[in-house]
A protein has these predicted regions:
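Active-site-proximal loop/turn and secondary-structure-junction residues that shape catalytic pockets
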Residues: 11-13, 35-37, 69-72, 105-109, ...
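Active-site acidic/histidine proton-transfer and metal-coordination neighborhood
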Residues: 14-21, 55-58, 74-169, 178, ...
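Conserved beta-strand positions in the central sheet of alpha/beta enzyme cores
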Residues: 32, 65-67, 102, 140, ...
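Glycine-rich, proline-tolerant flexible connector loops at the mouths of alpha/beta enzymes
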Residues: 32-53, 106-112
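Short, solvent-exposed loop/turn segments at secondary-structure boundaries
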Residues: 42-46, 75-80, 112-117, 180-183, ...
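Catalytic-core regions built around general acid/base machinery
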Residues: 47-58, 124-131, 187, 222-226
Length: 276
């Protein structure tokens, strides 16, 4: 089984040429598009998209997924504008030749049990999923801190409640660690039936600090091994967050991204997992 390496190239630099240079240096042939030229993917103009696509074609790089911001808003915010952004992102995904769009399940109001908002979240995710179904896309839900689906049991419940093959899961070990979860022990078994994508960063349980893969408490090696043994073939996407980590993104810089890439490849080699 082969894993395909990818990464959030905006963690390298806002500049596309810089991004492609580092991806090439690390022999990574795909990227996950979250932003470029300091512009979020959902806000890219037609001319920017055309320039982006032509540059990737020239470099021999493809898009593994759209790292969209969809669902990373307050639960009480109006849904209509988010559905419009989802349609825009769907157009971009189709134009760039990828089927996978990362999404989130909304920031829940603090101080109340998240389960109190379950029905509202399900309804919103179902509305987003209907757009994906119409466009032939797969929404990959990321377990993000402070959203409804921040823990494995709520992620799994949400996916089963929506009940569509167009709504699946991506797995972020560091985010689980920062929520007090042992990612592989507590999360992998629940979410493996729905996993279509893996985002790679690790974290220390004691402090929440983000570290390269295999250097924290995220049980990344265990998850990689289990995915291989289960027959997973798909994208393993670096999201290093080694320089900055905020609510809406992160940054590593060229050397930080390379350090994260080399740590992941060393871990895959140690586990005898093939990748390209």
């Amino acid at each position: 089984m082969t894993f395909i390496l990818s990464g959030f190239a905006d963690e390298i630099s806002p500049d596309l040429d810089d991004q492609l240079a580092i991806l090439g240096a690390e022999s990574i042939s795909h990227l996950e598009l979250r932003s470029v030229w300091s512009t979020n993917v959902a806000d890219l103009s037609g001319s920017q998209l055309a320039s982006f696509r032509h540059a990737l074609d020239d470099a021999g790089v493809r898009v593994s997924a759209i790292g969209s911001p969809i669902g990373k808003i307050e639960l009480e915010a109006p849904l209509g504008p988010e559905l419009e952004r989802m349609r825009c992102v769907a157009d971009i995904a189709s134009e760039l030749g990828t089927q996978i769009v990362r999404v989130f399940s909304f920031f829940v109001p603090p101080g109340a049990p998240p389960e109190r908002h379950r029905r509202q979240v399900i309804d919103r995710m179902f509305a987003l999923t209907e757009i994906a179904e119409d466009r032939g896309l797969i929404l990959a839900h990321e377990n993000e801190k402070e959203i409804y689906g921040d823990r494995p049991e709520r992620c799994a419940d949400l996916i089963t409640a929506v009940g569509s093959p167009a709504f699946r899961a991506t797995f972020d070990a560091a985010n689980f660690v920062q929520c007090g979860v042992q990612p592989h022990t507590e999360g992998y078994g629940l979410l493996r039936p729905y996993l279509v994508y893996l985002q790679v960063k690790d974290a220390l349980a004691a402090t929440g600090e983000v570290v390269p893969a295999g250097q924290g408490d995220g049980q990344v090696g265990e998850t990689l091994s289990a995915l291989r043994d289960s027959g997973f073939e798909g994208y393993v996407s670096l999201e290093p967050h080694l320089g900055e980590a905020g609510r809406y993104g992160g940054f590593s810089g060229p050397q930080g991204f390379r350090r994260a890439a080399q740590a992941l490849k060393a871990l895959l080699d140690e586990l005898s997992i093939s990748y390209q």
